Amino acid sequence: DVGHAVYLEHRQECRRKLRCIEVSMFLQYVVMHFKNDRWSLDACAGKAIADNVFPRNKTVCTKTLYNYVDLGLLPLKNMDLPEKLRRSTKKHKDKENKKKLGRSIEERPKSVDLREEFGHWEIDSVLGKNREGEPVVLSLTERKLRVSIWLKVKDHSAEAVDESLKELFTSFGDKYKEVFKTITADNGSEFANISVLEQSGIGIYFTHPYTSCEKGTVECHNRLLRRFIPKGKSIDDYTADEIMIFADIINGLPRKILGYHTPEELFDAELDRIYAA
């Protein structure tokens, strides 16, 4: 009857609250990293388990953490969880240059699709206010390690992109071709000149028009950038150093797909290997 159902619900509620007390140290850990380090709930749970921060019986799984948020048992709200918000399914056609800019992604080595080798990057540009002469963010993401490099570029021109890429490669010294083996771009006019990089031994490939899914890794990380720079916000409002710090924050997030390692620590290990050779 109704009374019995209410009793069972109250009993279940008491059990939940008792469990929260049992795992209170773990929940403090979750809230701290969520608020201070911008970790997702899954990253908090997975990293704690992977590093044996707490005994397993003193933790709860990701699904339970989301349930706690729904029930008001954590000082977080669903609106604080960007990965839980419904994404718009409206498709936008990118204004891309239909002229063939270089080699098609169909010519890219099939091994790149496997994500087993380091050094294969996707590149994109992220706009602030869509106006002429406005700075943009040049966004690069490595396919295997999911590490991102975000650079403030003075404008959306091919010349500005070329200049920023040259500075980036210079920062890696004579090993830059081992760090950047291939780069995959779309047919945007800002990438009109990057095929010239093939003269230095870097493979440059272009996706088919209107198929952003062919560089889905960088597209996904662009959404993470929007946590810091919302659409319509002028990139002039941010310094180059601030934008690099945003990348550092994202690269410091433990990832389930990386065994709850961070892209930063795996990238550093890869660079150590390259420069030690």
Question: What is each of the regions a protein language model found here?
Answer:
Residues 113, 126-127, 132-149:
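Short conserved beta-strand segments at catalytic cores or DNA/RNA-binding microdomains
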Residues 199-201:
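Short, structured coil segments at secondary-structure junctions
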Residues 129, 133, 150-175:
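Active-site beta-loop-alpha junctions of metal-dependent nucleic acid enzymes
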Residues 30, 44, 65, 124, ...:
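Mobile genetic element proteins and their domesticated derivatives, centered on retroelements
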Residues 112, 231-277:
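C-terminal domain-tail junction helix/linker
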Residues 1-36, 42, 47:
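Short, basic alpha-helical/linker "hinge" immediately adjacent to a nucleic-acid-recognition surface
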Residues 9-10, 54-114:
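Basic, flexible linker segments flanking DNA-binding modules
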